[in-house]
């Protein structure tokens, strides 16, 4: 543990941010997995709605700084391409 008070505070803040980022990334992975499962099952209408949800979550994560803005856009683009190829 750090001895300096500001360093102790930074440790607490970093732990909170790490927990938040981990939670957001887990939600992203789950949303993407559900989209791909519905796509693999052939439920294209469900996949379209799930893609909208994934897009929303990705852009929210980018806005919070959890992932980079370009990474969010790239993932949305690739998932949309997957959906369009499957239809």
Swiss-Prot record:
GO terms for cellular component: cytosol; small ribosomal subunit. GO terms for biological process: translation. Gene3D superfamilies: Ribosomal protein S20. It holds the Pfam family Ribosomal_S20p. Keywords: Ribonucleoprotein, Ribosomal protein, RNA-binding, rRNA-binding. The keyword Thylakoid does not apply. The keyword Transmembrane helix does not apply. Binds directly to 16S ribosomal RNA. PANTHER family: 30S RIBOSOMAL PROTEIN S20, SMALL RIBOSOMAL SUBUNIT PROTEIN BS20C. Belongs to the bacterial ribosomal protein bS20 family. This is Small ribosomal subunit protein bS20. It comes from Alkaliphilus oremlandii (strain OhILAs). The gene is rpsT.
